Amino acid sequence: DAGTAYITIPSTSVKNTRWEFGVHLTFNPSANNYARFYLTSSSNILSGNLNGYYIQIGGAKDNVALYRQNGNQSKLLASGRELMKGNSSPKLYIKVERDNNGYWTFWTRLESENEYVKEKQIKDTDIQTSRYCGIYCIYTKTRCKGFTFHHIQLSNDVETNTSPDETPDNPDTDLPDNPDTPELPRDVRGMLLFNEIMYNNATDGAEYVEIYNPTEQAVILPAL
């Protein structure tokens, strides 16, 4: 049936943080079928009121955009190119950085592109803390199995910028057969990777999330 699905893990990272992930949609996104990657969130219930930042993939436009959410109100901070326009099965990679001074920068790359394209940079320090990060999908009945997130990484080695190089937006106005695994940073302490997510599986199938710890240290998850 039509509805929403989400998954979260504890995460307090905000400053000097980089988020990277791949997305594959088996449909062209629309106002009724799109996804959000919550970079930060005050709540583990992504369908309710919360304070945080998220990247939206699709929606009214076939692009990737950065939003800030306060309670149940979302504000567009920066909007990227319409890289999914006319694409019935978009495959893309997204990278977001937030430095110590509050500058947010995000890049996108289609699977067919060799390098990331810098979309926008904007300063926003309205929300300084986080408790979770996660994935949130909104879908109609026929699209409920059409979302795949992969190669998810979070690291804390972002350099600090001094000034934005882009003008902020005015809010008023198939996975590869053998995908390349991004190289991990040398220091991966405290880093966890979402390796695979499966939800709304067949009637007799199991739903699961696979989390990979690339370090040699044990990591305790108090909640999932």
Residues covered by each model-derived region:
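A structural motif detector for short, solvent-exposed N-terminal "entry" segments of globular domains
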Residues: P182-L224
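Extracellular glycan-recognition regions
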Residues: D1-E183
